[in-house]
Amino acid sequence: MKKILSAIIALALCASVAVGASGCGCEKNKKTAKNTTSTSSGPGYKVEPTNPDFEEGQFGFYRLNDNEVKVTVYNGNEKNIEIPATANGSKVTVVGANLFQASDIESVKIPEGVTEIQKHAFSSCQNLKEVNFPDGLKVIGENAFWNCKKLEKIELPSTLKKIEWYAFSATGVKSISIPLSDTLSTLPEKVFFQCSNLSEVTLPLSITNIADDTFAECADNLTIKAYTGSYGVSYAKNHNIKLEEMPRS
C-alpha cells in the first residue's frame, strides 16, 4: 500500500512540474524560423540577418518567392561594393537587415529592382562615403544608415513610400532634398537626429507630417527651405528652425 501511495505522489509531482514548465513561457526561447530577425530597433542594436538559401559569388541570398530574392550575407572583403541585380535567375529586390553593419565598406551600388533596404543594413559603416539609391526604391528601414559618419551626400529617389525612424541619424550629411513624391508624406522620429553637419533641408509640398525630433541635434545653422503656405513653413516656424520660403510656381 505504501508503494502504491508513493507512486501516486510521484506522478502528481511530475504533472505539476510539467504544467509549470508549459506555462512559464519557456517555449518562447526556442529558435524561430530562419527568416525571422531581431525586433530590437534602437540605434546600434544588432539585428541578426536572415540565413541564406543559397550563395552566389560573395553573397548569400534568401528566396522570397519564385522570382525574387533578398541578399542577406556578404562574405567578401571589398571596400567598393556592387550588389548584383540577379542571383540564380531571380531578381534581387531586398537588401537584408544587418547586411553590412559595422563593416569598412566605402561605397555601394544598389541595383535597379531593389525596392527595400531593411533595418541596420549599413549602420555604423564608418567609412561609407557613397551610396546610390535606385529608382524604384520604396522603403528605407529603421537605422539603415545610422552612424555612417562619412556619408555626406544623399540623393533619394521620388519612388520612396516610407523612410523609417533613425534611418539617416548621426550621418555626415550636409544637405538633403526630400523628393517630391505622391507616396511619401511623412518624416518620422529622428530620421536625421544628431546629423551635426546638416545645415540645409529642402521640403516638397508632398510632405505633410514631420515628427518633432526629426531634426533634433542637427547643425545650429540648420535652414529649412519650403514652399510658401506649405506644411514645411509652419513646421520650421513652430520648431524655431531658420526658414527660407520658396515661391510656388
Task: Annotate each predicted stretch with a short phrase.
Residues 58-59, 64-67, 76-93, 103-116, ...:
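Structural signature of tandem-repeat unit edges
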Residues 3-26:
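Sec-dependent N-terminal signal peptides of Gram-positive bacterial secreted proteins and lipoproteins
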Residues 96-99, 118-123, 141-146, 164-169, ...:
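Consensus positions within tandem repeat domains that build extended binding/scaffold surfaces
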Residues 2, 29, 35-38, 120, ...:
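Asparagine/serine/threonine-enriched low-complexity, disordered tracts
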